[in-house]
Curated annotation (Swiss-Prot):
A Pfam family it matches: Auxin_inducible
Keywords carried by this UniProt record: Auxin signaling pathway
Presence of keyword Acyltransferase: no
Similarity comment text for this entry: Belongs to the ARG7 family.
Transmembrane segments: none
Tree of life domain: Eukaryota
InterPro entries associated with the record: SAUR_fam
Protein name: Auxin-induced protein 15A
Biological process according to GO: auxin-activated signaling pathway
Inducing stimuli: By auxin.
Length: 82
């Protein structure tokens, strides 16, 4: 059993995200998600960005944007943005 979040693309092994998308790393295992850049304007996603800034500043361990929440919380928030 599974579900699909249309706004989130399956992370590929390529380091680059497609045009209009951005890679973020989420959860303890730093799972990679590729999300639309339009999420950056959403208040609920901006809250996640504020948490990331408080925890990591501008030094993100994966080299990309790291979101300090569980994968479940991230998927719940992003599913509401679709």
């Amino acid at each position: 059993m599974g579900f699909r979040l249309p706004g989130i693309r399956k992370a590929s092994k390529a380091a680059d995200a497609p045009k209009g998308y951005l890679a973020v790393y989420v959860g303890e295992k730093l799972k990679r998600f590729v999300i639309p850049v339009s999420y950056l304007n959403q208040p609920s996603f901006q809250d996640l960005l504020s948490q990331a800034e408080e925890e990591f500043g501008y030094d993100h361990p994966m080299g990309g944007l790291t979101i300090p929440c569980s994968e479940d919380v991230f998927q719940c928030i992003t599913s509401c943005l679709n």
